[in-house]
Amino acid sequence: MKILVDENMPYARDLFSRLGEVTAVPGRPIAVAQLADADALMVRSVTKVNESLLAGKPIKFVGTATAGTDHVDEAWLKQAGIGFSAAPGCNAIAVVEYVFSSLLMLAERDGFSLHDRTVGIVGVGNVGRRLQARLEALGIKTLLCDPPRADRGDEGDFRSLDELVQHADILTFHTPLFKDGPYKTLHLADEKLIRSLKPGAILINACRGAVVDNTALLTCLNEGQKLSVVLDVWEGEPELNVELLTKVDIGTPHIAGYTLEGKARGTTQVFEAYSKFIGHEQHVALDTLLPAPEFGRITLHGPLDQPTLKRLVHLVYDVRRDDAPLRKVAGIPGEFDKLRKNYLERREWSSLYVICDDASAASLLCKLGFNAVHHPAR
C-alpha cells in the first residue's frame, strides 16, 4: 500500500508508515506522476484536490490535515467513490491564541483595555466558539453572527452582520469560504461593510483570504479610514497584495493555525480516519508525539491583569515574530510558501505550566487554556 503525504505534515511519515509505504511530497504542486501508483493521498490546504488531479488515478482515500475543506472537491470525490476525511477543529485553539496575541499587542500599543471593547465574532464553529468562551472568561462582551447556525436553531444569541458592524469595536472572521449559495462568504467583508465599521475598529481575518475583499480594504485604508487590520490570510495566496501588507497593522503568511499541537492533531485525525477506512483502526495519544516545551514552568505572583496576561501569552507566542519576516520577503516569488514550510516551532498555551499564588488567577488561566495550578505563598 503506497501513501503520499505532504512533506510539511508533522509526524506523518512515522504514523502512516504503520499502515504502508510512505512517500513525502511537496504540496504545491503535487507531481501528477507520483499519483500513478498511490493508494492514498494526505494533503494540506495548499493542494487543490479535484477531478483534474485524481481522474484516472488509483487513489482510494484522501485526507486533509486541515479544518477547512474548500480546497477539496468533496462532491467529485464522493461521485468517484474515493474516501475522504478532514480534521475539523484541529487548529482551532491555535487560531484563537493567534487572535489573542494580536489583540493584546494592539491593546498595549494603542493603550486600551479589552474590557472596554465589544468583540464581534463572525462564524461560530470550532474557532468562534472557543474564542467566545475565552473572551467571556475575561469578562469581554461578545456578539455572535452565524446565519447557518441561526437558521438551524442552534443554541446561541445570534445577531445579524449589520448589528455586529454597528456595535462591535473588534470584528473577527472565522467562516468557511462559500463562493455562492444562501450563505455566501466570498467578499463578506466588502467595501460597504468596511466603510461602515466604527472609527478605530479592529478588523481580523484568520479564516480564508477572500472572505475580505482585499482590493476594497486597500482602497479604504488608502483613503485614510481609521481602522486597525490583522490579516493572516490573503486573496490570491501564495501571491498577496504587497501594498496592502504595508498598510495593515499585522500581516502573517497563513500561519494562525500553525501550532505544533494543531498540526499534530490534524495529522493524527486523518491517520485515525484512514486506519479505520482500511480496517486497521488505530488511535494516537497526542502527548506521545509532542516534545517537551521550551519553558517548563513559571511562577506568577498576584492577580491576573491585562499586562500580565499579555506577557504570558507573548512568552508562548508573540505574533510579531511572524509579521516581520513576511514584510521582508513580500513580493518575492516562492517566499510566502517558504515561510510556511520552514515555520519555527510554536506551542499552545497549554504547554506553559504556571504556578500561581493567587487562586483566582490560577482558575482564570485554566479557563483560558493554560496549564495552571494554585500554590499559596508561604
From Swiss-Prot:
Pathway where this protein functions: Cofactor biosynthesis; pyridoxine 5'-phosphate biosynthesis; pyridoxine 5'-phosphate from D-erythrose 4-phosphate: step 2/5
Molecular functions (GO terms): 4-phosphoerythronate dehydrogenase activity; NAD binding; protein dimerization activity
Membrane-spanning segments: none
GO biological process: 'de novo' pyridoxal 5'-phosphate biosynthetic process; pyridoxine biosynthetic process
GO CC list: cytosol
Positions with a binding annotation for substrate: S45, T66, Y258
Residues that coordinate or bind NAD(+): D146, T175, D232, G257
Keyword Oxidoreductase: yes
Catalytic reactions of this protein: 4-phospho-D-erythronate + NAD(+) = (R)-3-hydroxy-2-oxo-4-phosphooxybutanoate + NADH + H(+)
Assigned EC number: 1.1.1.290
Enzyme class, broadest EC rank: oxidoreductase
Subcellular localization: Cytoplasm
Domain of life where this protein originates: Bacteria
Active-site residues, Swiss-Prot/TrEMBL: R208, E237, H254
Keyword set, alphabetical order: Cytoplasm, NAD, Oxidoreductase, Pyridoxine biosynthesis
Main location: cytoplasm
HAMAP family: PdxB
Described function: Catalyzes the oxidation of erythronate-4-phosphate to 3-hydroxy-2-oxo-4-phosphonooxybutanoate.
Membership in a protein family: Belongs to the D-isomer specific 2-hydroxyacid dehydrogenase family. PdxB subfamily.
Complex and partners: Homodimer.
Name of the featured protein: Erythronate-4-phosphate dehydrogenase
Species this protein is from: Shigella boydii serotype 4 (strain Sb227)
Name of encoding gene: pdxB
